Amino acid sequence: MIKEDRFLEKIADFCISKSKALGSTSSNVLVMNTISENVNIRNKKLDGSERSENLGVTLTTYIGKKKASISSTNFSENNLIELVTRCIDSTKVTPEDEYNSLPDQELHFKGEKNLELYDNTHLSNDEKINFIKEAEEVAFSHDKIVNTNGSGFSETKSNFI
């Protein structure tokens, strides 16, 4: 199940507040969760089924015109503290670049954040397999088709802050 916004926001808030406490003049954080499922059928038989779940955080900190970014997939509190600390330490030793900064506040988007693009539909693995088996059956119902390169069903859900 995809993580709720509040879970991702909590991680983002922690990273931003910790980076400010350690000296960043500004910071940016991306917290994302992605779940991908793939099922493949070849010659009417299951050829493969994969599922992957990824959680990740990327923190960018600024100190004046210095900037550094660090990413992690470990969301433990100790690791997040280490992530922020390492990012701040890296920022301190990077050279200044006059173009390093976040956009001015007046340039930030102020409209509705929820674009309502998320599709809550979920098919079980068995439903996916039945769907693509049916597609292969239709292909094989034609006399001249004796082999296929297979059929597949892919589903990816993502949430990010």
State each model region's role:
Residues 1-161:
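Active-site bordering "gate/hinge" segments
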